[in-house]
């Protein structure tokens, strides 16, 4: 009897899907993903938005995209977006990226620029990481890690590039609706496939601006709460959250925010900018002055 009821329910679901247009099926799948993974997919606002999306009758894929985007902003917040095939192709052409760099400033102070990075392949990751690691000395009097303009991307190569300045423990947490995930330094290194190098014990200054976002903010928070660390510059962009891409039938990606960033201090960050320890319009000069005093 139970089996009969179950089969009947499956048949009814199949009939409903068969009666829906391609555009309605697209919206339906997007809403199901938001229901399951969306950081803010709960409460009256989401229920109202969800119902409106499912009741809509999009006639074109552009209309389906717009309905999906409207729902996405409620379920996932400002860090979520719909990445269409056209957008992906344009991004692939534009995403040449900037190389990280290591230079010596006064004395034995290092200046490490960690730019945005969206690479995913092993070769791309290792090239980015070793551009920094291969230029680091055995010791330093201090280091300036420059995150200005780092709009995000793949955080693991960024963290791995400066792992010698981080402790070998949990460096960040992701706090979702139903879960909290810990990120350790060793996990990051395993993910990118490199061996840990000896620690460099020195004061760390971090530079931020209004473009420091997403993975750039995550890297900033990896240092939050550590002794002998100070940040300088301007408040960040306020995208301190983690999102994941979910493939859609037409090749687009539903990039959905699933968790907020949590520092070792217990502080949870998400849509609000992260203020620097020392606000200044001359962050490099201020950082060097602080390092001289250590």
Which functions belong to the PLM regions below?
Residues 30, 71, 112, 145, ...:
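Terminal peptide-recognition signature
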Residues 15-22:
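Bacterial Sec-dependent signal peptides at the C-terminal "C-region" and cleavage site
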Residues 121-141:
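A short, well-ordered alpha-helical element
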Residues 8-14:
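Bacterial N-terminal signal peptides
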Residues 39-107:
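Extended, small/polar residue-biased N-terminal targeting/export presequences
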Residues 152-205, 241-251, 258-262, 268:
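Gly/Ser/Thr-rich loop/hinge elements
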Residues 140-155:
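Short, glycine-/small-residue-enriched flexible loop/hinge segments at domain edges that mediate gating
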Residues 99-127:
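STAS-typified acidic loop motif
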